[in-house]
């Protein structure tokens, strides 16, 4: 760890549901000059975040899934208004070089990877001054983990459910952002 110059990433579930603990951990890490990164889906109390976690955070990986609030509620369980507002706030800090923010879009076939959704996300990125982002290709390995979490129900959202995303689909998704001048990083 020390030889590599690495840092500490806290992710979840939603790590920011434990802001007291994350803030304390990051505070101690910063005392040792360790780089800190939080991965979030964006559903958190910004005032608490601003006081407890932000002062000790170097980088935020901020996942955005769906722009339509009804679809977000259907698939994620909550509307996305506060998520978008939190993104605007942290991205404003990134524009002022207070913190590094990397927006990320997890691609789920026929849900988050539609042209309509990705175009809306791209427009939202432009409105917020984003020039670089990451897309996270769908990975079907999670399906085999469901029984370990007590779930016997296998979700099915079409023929893409059990397959890795083909390169042509990743190219299509990438082009939606890059055609608007947003650089996309994607691990294939």
Task: Please provide the spans of the model-predicted regions.
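Radical SAM enzyme core and accessory elements
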Residues: 179-188
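A structural motif corresponding to the C-terminal lobe/cap of the Radical SAM core domain
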Residues: 123, 146-176
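Polar/charged alpha-helical tracts
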Residues: 27, 92, 127, 168, ...
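Conserved AdoMet/S-adenosylmethionine-binding subsite of the radical SAM
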Residues: 1-141, 147
């Amino acid at each position: 760890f020390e030889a590599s110059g690495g840092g500490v990433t806290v992710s979840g579930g939603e790590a920011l549901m434990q802001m007291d603990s994350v803030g304390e951990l990051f505070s101690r890490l910063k005392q040792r000059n360790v780089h800190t990164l939080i991965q979030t889906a964006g559903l958190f109390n910004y005032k608490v975040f601003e006081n407890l976690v932000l002062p000790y955070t170097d980088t935020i990986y901020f996942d955005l899934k769906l722009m339509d609030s009804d679809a977000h509620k259907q698939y994620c369980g909550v509307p996305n208004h506060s998520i978008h507002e939190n993104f605007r706030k942290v991205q404003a800090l990134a524009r002022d070089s207070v913190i590094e923010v990397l927006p990320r879009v997890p691609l789920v076939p026929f849900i988050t990877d539609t042209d309509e959704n990705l175009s809306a996300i791209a427009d939202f990125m432009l409105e917020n001054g984003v020039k670089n982002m990451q897309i996270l290709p769908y990975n079907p390995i999670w399906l085999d983990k469901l029984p370990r979490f007590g779930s016997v129900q296998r979700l099915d959202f079409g023929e893409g459910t059990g397959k890795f995303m083909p390169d042509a689909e990743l190219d299509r998704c990438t082009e939606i952002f890059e055609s608007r001048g947003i650089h996309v990083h994607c691990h294939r």
